[in-house]
Amino acid sequence: MSSDKDIQKRRFFRLTYPRTAQPSLRNDDGSSYKVLEVSEKGLVLELCSGEPFKVGDAVCGKILFHDNQSEYIEGLVYRLDSRGAVVTLNNNISFRNIMREQSYIRSNFPLFFRQKMVGKPTPENSSDDQ
């Protein structure tokens, strides 16, 4: 039997990026943000001090993935937390792009990928994401 801890409670798989592989989001207003996590229906954007996001703000722009593929997204800031701005999307990020990104991270950052998949914390400046 599985415990509640072992059961995936999210509807969509989340892909967390190592620091050196984070794609950028070019917002329609010209600003640019690092993408920390991505799923088909949401993402987490890195916030630097003084960033203008508030809960409910619209986010529209293009994500540029590692293979130079891009995808236009539209969504709203759902919440702000210690990681950054959590954005729920009105449109899906394609499953194909999610899988390509997962494959890239798995191939190029195997230790990072394994640590994230088994839920072990990754040190901020670990050598596995270089």
Where do the protein language model's features map onto the residues?
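N-terminal helix initiation/capping motif
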Residues: 1-38, 103-130
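Short solvent-exposed strand/turn elements
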Residues: 22, 49-55, 87-107
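Short strand-loop-strand
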Residues: 24-52, 81-86
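A generic membrane alpha-helix/interface feature
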Residues: 57, 64, 78-80, 92, ...
